């Protein structure tokens, strides 16, 4: 299972929100580039960036920080937040971003998502942020009437490379991921699902492994990495490539 450290950008700084509330933000580092370098050095194979200002404004805001992070790293970076038209998507991909994450337009303009999936195959991921099973939009400030599972199935048909599922009520709470919601969502899809929100300890990651056979093949970790409740290297050893579960047994000769 892939471990994706998260960097949330607000005002050019690395922050974390509590349950998506912009009024409950905590600055963890003034320099997001330095944070990104640290996660790469500790073994991350992909980085997850969210432009919180962009999600609120409806267009990317922290472009300088994003460009600097992409330039500083050798691992791929995926970015979401405020991507609601083709030009903004292409702008980020031209910067060297590996994958872009679409959220609001998946609800408001699904045809555009289909066009982007066709133009940029494998590079379009849809982020589904759910509040009580309904999809939230516009930086989590609004809640639609669309069911998360219904939207995910439609996005798969349109060509999305993966679905990132966030349970807003778990995000930043350190209460553990919503396994039931993830199980239900993944069972309806054939494309990969990436879990996000609530992971607070290695045991949460081990619990997610039970969903890997359904297609939950990645997990985004934010606050727990910044508080030190989870060490990235430990998480990778537990559920990433080369985890102890995957090591073949030693073939000792039989005695006698």
UniProtKB/Swiss-Prot annotation:
Pathway: Amino-acid biosynthesis; L-histidine biosynthesis; L-histidine from 5-phospho-alpha-D-ribose 1-diphosphate: step 4/9. One of its GO terms (molecular function) is 1-(5-phosphoribosyl)-5-[(5-phosphoribosylamino)methylideneamino]imidazole-4-carboxamide isomerase activity. The active site is at 8 (proton acceptor), 129 (proton donor). It comes from the Bacteria. CDD domains: HisA. GO terms for cellular component: cytoplasm. One of its GO terms (biological process) is L-histidine biosynthetic process. It catalyses: 1-(5-phospho-beta-D-ribosyl)-5-[(5-phospho-beta-D-ribosylamino)methylideneamino]imidazole-4-carboxamide = 5-[(5-phospho-1-deoxy-D-ribulos-1-ylimino)methylamino]-1-(5-phospho-beta-D-ribosyl)imidazole-4-carboxamide. Keywords: Amino-acid biosynthesis, Cytoplasm, Histidine biosynthesis, Isomerase. It is found in: Cytoplasm. Pfam families: His_biosynth (PF00977). Its EC number is 5.3.1.16. Belongs to the HisA/HisF family. This is 1-(5-phosphoribosyl)-5-[(5-phosphoribosylamino)methylideneamino] imidazole-4-carboxamide isomerase. It comes from Synechocystis sp. (strain ATCC 27184 / PCC 6803 / Kazusa). The lineage of its organism: Bacteria, Bacillati, Cyanobacteriota, Cyanophyceae, Synechococcales.
């Amino acid at each position: 299972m892939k471990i994706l450290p998260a960097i949330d950008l607000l005002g050019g700084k690395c922050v974390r929100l509590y349950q998506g509330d912009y009024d409950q933000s905590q600055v963890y580092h003034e320099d997001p580039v330095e944070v990104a370098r640290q996660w790469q050095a500790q073994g991350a194979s992909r980085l997850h960036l969210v432009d919180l200002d962009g999600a609120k404004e409806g267009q990317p805001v922290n472009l300088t920080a994003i460009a600097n992070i992409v330039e500083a790293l050798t691992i791929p970076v995926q970015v979401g937040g405020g991507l609601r038209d083709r030009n903004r998507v292409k702008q980020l991909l031209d910067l060297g971003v590996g994958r872009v994450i679409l959220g609001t337009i998946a609800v408001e303009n699904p045809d555009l998502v289909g066009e982007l999936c066709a133009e940029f195959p494998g590079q379009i991921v849809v982020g589904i942020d759910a509040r009580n099973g309904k999809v939230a939009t516009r930086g989590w400030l609004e809640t639609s009437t669309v069911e998360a599972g219904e939207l995910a199935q439609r996005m798969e048909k349109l060509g999305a490379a993966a679905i990132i599922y966030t349970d807003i009520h778990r995000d930043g709470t350190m209460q553990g991921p919503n396994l039931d919601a993830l199980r239900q969502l993944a069972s309806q899809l054939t494309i990969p699902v990436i879990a996000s929100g609530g992971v607070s300890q290695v045991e949460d990651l081990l619990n997610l492994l039970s969903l890997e056979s359904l297609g939950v093949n990645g997990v985004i970790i934010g606050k727990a990495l910044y508080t030190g409740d989870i060490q990235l290297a430990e998480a990778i050893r537990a559920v990433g490539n080369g985890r102890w579960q995957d090591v073949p047994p030693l073939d000792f000769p039989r005695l006698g």
